[in-house]
A protein has these predicted regions:
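Short-chain dehydrogenase/reductase
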Residues: 26-42, 91-92, 122-123
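Short, amphipathic alpha-helical "lid/cap" segments that border enzyme active or binding sites
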Residues: 71, 75, 94-102, 166-181
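Active-site Tyr-X1-5-Lys
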Residues: 8, 31-58
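Mid/C-terminal beta-alpha module of Rossmann-like enzyme folds, strongest
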Residues: 98-100, 107-151
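Short acidic donor-binding/metal-coordinating loop in glycosyltransferase active sites
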Residues: 14, 57, 120
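C-terminal amphipathic/interface module of NAD(P)-dependent oxidoreductases
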Residues: 138-182
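Conserved Rossmann-fold NAD(P)-dependent oxidoreductase catalytic core, especially the SDR/UDP-sugar
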Residues: 1-32
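NAD(P)-dependent short-chain dehydrogenase/reductase
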Residues: 46-89, 95-96, 102
Length: 182
C-alpha cells in the first residue's frame, strides 16, 4: 500500500498468537498458538510485518450487535458467572487503542513498520470482571474459578511506551463507559 498508493497500514493482531504458557511475551517472541484463531493471526502477522505496523494486543469493548467479547458477554449474563483467577491478560479498552492509533497517525514519528505489543496492567479475568461488576452495577455472582491456567501477558514495546501512556483498568473502563453512553 505504501509503495503503490502512498498509504500505510496499521493491522490489529492479538495476544492469542501465544499459547499462554510462557508469559510475559515480547514483540520479538515467536508465536506458539495452539488453536486455529491464534495460528491464523500469527500468519497474518508474518505476512504483514515487513510492510505494516502490526499492533498486537487484547481488547475489551462494547459491541454493536453481538455479545462475544468478555465485557458484553458478562453484562449479558444473569446470575452465576465463573471468573478465572489464573487466566491473565493485559490488553486495553477499544477506546484506549483508538486513542493510541490516532496518536500514531498524527505523530511524525509514531508510525513504524514491524510488530509492536500494546499492553496495560496485568489482570486476571476474575479481577477484571469484579471491576466491571462494580462499575456497571451488575448483580451477577462472580464465582472464583481456578480450572483455567493461562497467561497471555505482553511486554509493552518501547516504541509504544514513547507514544502512549496507559491507565489502570478502572480508569480505562470509566473513560470507555462515559464515551459509550454519550
Amino acid at each position: 500500500l505504501k509503495l503503490k498508493y502512498g498509504y500505510s497500514l496499521i493491522h490489529i493482531s492479538s495476544d492469542c498468537v501465544f499459547s499462554g504458557l510462557n508469559a510475559p511475551y515480547s514483540d520479538t517472541d515467536q508465536p506458539d498458538a495452539l488453536d486455529h484463531y491464534g495460528a491464523t493471526k500469527a500468519i497474518s502477522e508474518t505476512l504483514l510485518e515487513a510492510d505494516a505496523m502490526v499492533l498486537r494486543t487484547s481488547t475489551v469493548g462494547h459491541e454493536q450487535n453481538t455479545k462475544h467479547g468478555l465485557l458484553e458477554w458478562f453484562l449479558s449474563q444473569s446470575g452465576r458467572v465463573n471468573g478465572y483467577k489464573n487466566a491473565y491478560f493485559n490488553g486495553v479498552t477499544t477506546l484506549t487503542l483508538a486513542k493510541l492509533i490516532y496518536q500514531l497517525i498524527c505523530s511524525n514519528v509514531g508510525f513504524r513498520i514491524g510488530i509492536f505489543n500494546v499492553a496495560s496492567e496485568r489482570i486476571s479475568k476474575y479481577d477484571f470482571l469484579c471491576i466491571v461488576q462494580k462499575l456497571y452495577r451488575s448483580d451477577n455472582n462472580i464465582v472464583p474459578d481456578e480450572k483455567v491456567d493461562i497467561d497471555r501477558s505482553l511486554i509493552q514495546s518501547k516504541h509504544i511506551n514513547e507514544n502512549y501512556c496507559h491507565s489502570d483498568w478502572m480508569t480505562q473502563l470509566i473513560q470507555m463507559k462515559e464515551e459509550f453512553n454519550d
